[in-house]
């Protein structure tokens, strides 16, 4: 029995399913999850010392790579002064100013502790500000696990084959309208049915929780226009895409301006952080300046703030945004080329530092329905063959992959060599 298997067995005795987030259990791909002991740069190391090229990056935050010296130095220096104060700090102002500088649609920002907390708070703010109850989201998009948003959700919920979760009251779910991602007509229909009831539209600008699905041309702009027409707020959930698709987020890449933005992952540099922000007029509706309540014991934690500041300052350096996109493109096109050589139907979507692979005979994957029609079994075989060779992909056919600035051309080349062998295995009788 491997060390990971022993640890997993032990974990299952005291942690539900042996993990603290469902997708980590490998239920989507089968087998035993790999237990990681340390990480550095583009690599993670399991408890037996095996090294993997990491394309999960802690599910997105590690955009600079693991254990980056600037972040580590900032965290250690800040920790010497204390771990948490429960008071305002200079560091939270500095990170807020940095976020407002990099994302022009954000005039004010409130720090929280997770992406789920950010989206939950933004939804409450939108409802309070508009004095409306209904919200509109998209099938296959995931915005955290708050009750209002865990309706036909993607991510781990999609992986486990549960379109919604038990424990979400119907009274909550009835206020959530679910439309088709990349189908603007479905949104128009919803607004026509509930013209004065929709508080907000919330969307992942790149749907990273049904793998990696890009918005069709004018989809995001169309949502903006509909929100303007019907008096609803437009929320772009950049927890995953923020500072990763582009330095100003996916909203800058696709040239669309939301009323509110939610952030997480990258802004913590690996520490637990979330944030939501937007127009000053709307944000001032939050307590203590407004009637909508939101609070948090560890919000604005100084160590997390220092990590976020260090991370964003590194990302601002000239050439980093372009290099991240270049590495992602090299990997994506390389995988597609190898699949073609092996006559394996494959669609590879990518943008900025995100990518997704779909085993499918379809020419493109632009919707939830197309995503769930892909060959999950073939992905699972590919995943394990890559894992054997020291390449760690997301353990689910419905999760995006993440590039980091620590990855090198040599890492991409090694990954493609492993993929060549994995594709060949898929063609062999033992994997057919």
Curated annotation (Swiss-Prot):
InterPro entries: 4pyrrol_synth_GluAld_NH2Trfase (IPR004639), Aminotrans_3 (IPR005814), Aminotrans_3_PPA_site (IPR049704), PyrdxlP-dep_Trfase (IPR015424), PyrdxlP-dep_Trfase_major (IPR015421), PyrdxlP-dep_Trfase_small (IPR015422)
Keywords associated with the record: Cytoplasm, Isomerase, Porphyrin biosynthesis, Pyridoxal phosphate
GO cellular component: cytoplasm
Cofactor(s) needed: pyridoxal 5'-phosphate
EC number: 5.4.3.8
Domain of life: Bacteria
MF terms in GO: glutamate-1-semialdehyde 2,1-aminomutase activity; pyridoxal phosphate binding; transaminase activity
Presence of keyword Cytoplasm: yes
PROSITE patterns, A to Z: AA_TRANSFER_CLASS_3
GO BP annotations, alphabetical order: protoporphyrinogen IX biosynthetic process
Residue positions where N6-(pyridoxal phosphate)lysine is found in the record: 265
NCBIfam families: hemL (TIGR00713), PRK00062.1 (NF000818)
Similarity comment text for this entry: Belongs to the class-III pyridoxal-phosphate-dependent aminotransferase family. HemL subfamily.
Name under which the protein is recorded: Glutamate-1-semialdehyde 2,1-aminomutase
Gene that encodes it: hemL
């Amino acid at each position: 029995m491997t060390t990971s298997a022993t640890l997993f067995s032990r974990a299952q005795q005291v942690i539900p399913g042996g993990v603290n987030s469902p997708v980590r259990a490998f239920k989507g791909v089968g087998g035993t999850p790999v237990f990681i002991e340390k990480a550095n740069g583009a690599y993670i190391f399991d408890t037996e010392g095996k090294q993997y090229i990491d394309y999960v990056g802690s599910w997105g935050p590690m955009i600079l790579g693991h254990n980056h010296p600037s972040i580590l130095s900032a965290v250690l220096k800040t920790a010497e002064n204390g771990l948490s104060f429960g008071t305002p700090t200079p560091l939270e102002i500095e990170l807020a100013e940095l976020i407002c500088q990099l994302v022009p649609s954000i005039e004010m920002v409130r720090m929280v502790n997770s992406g789920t907390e950010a989206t939950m708070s933004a939804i409450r703010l939108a409802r309070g500000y508009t004095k409306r109850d209904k919200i509109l989201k998209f099938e296959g998009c995931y915005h955290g696990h708050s009750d209002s948003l865990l309706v036909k959700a993607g991510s781990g919920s999609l992986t486990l084959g549960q379109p919604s979760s038990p424990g979400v009251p119907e009274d909550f779910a009835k206020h959530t309208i679910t439309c088709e991602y990349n189908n603007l007509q479905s949104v128009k229909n919803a607004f026509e049915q509930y013209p004065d009831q929709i508080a907000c539209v919330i969307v992942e600008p790149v749907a990273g929780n049904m793998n990696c699905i890009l918005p069709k041309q004018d989809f995001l702009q169309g949502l903006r226009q509909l929100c303007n027409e019907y008096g609803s707020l437009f929320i772009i959930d950049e927890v995953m895409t923020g500072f990763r698709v582009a330095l100003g987020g996916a909203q800058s890449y696709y040239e669309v301006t939301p009323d509110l933005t939610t952030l997480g992952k990258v802004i913590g540099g690996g520490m637990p952080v979330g944030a939501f922000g937007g127009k000053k007029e709307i944000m001032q509706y939050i307590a203590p300046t407004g009637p909508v309540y939101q609070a948090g014991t560890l919000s604005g934690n100084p160590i997390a703030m220092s990590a976020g500041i260090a991370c964003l300052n590194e990302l601002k350096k000239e050439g980093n945004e372009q290099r991240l996109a270049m590495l992602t493109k090299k990997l994506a096109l390389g995988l597609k080329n190898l699949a073609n050589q092996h006559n394996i139907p494959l669609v590879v979507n990518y943008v900025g530092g995100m990518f997704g692979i779909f085993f499918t005979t379809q020419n493109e994957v632009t919707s939830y329905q197309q995503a769930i029609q892909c060959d999950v079994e073939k992905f699972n075989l590919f995943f394990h063959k890559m894992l054997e060779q020291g390449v760690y992909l997301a353990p689910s056919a419905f999760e995006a992959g993440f590039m980091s600035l620590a990855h090198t051309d040599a890492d991409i080349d090694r990954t493609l060599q492993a993929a060549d062998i994995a594709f060949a295995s898929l063609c062999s009788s033992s994997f057919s």
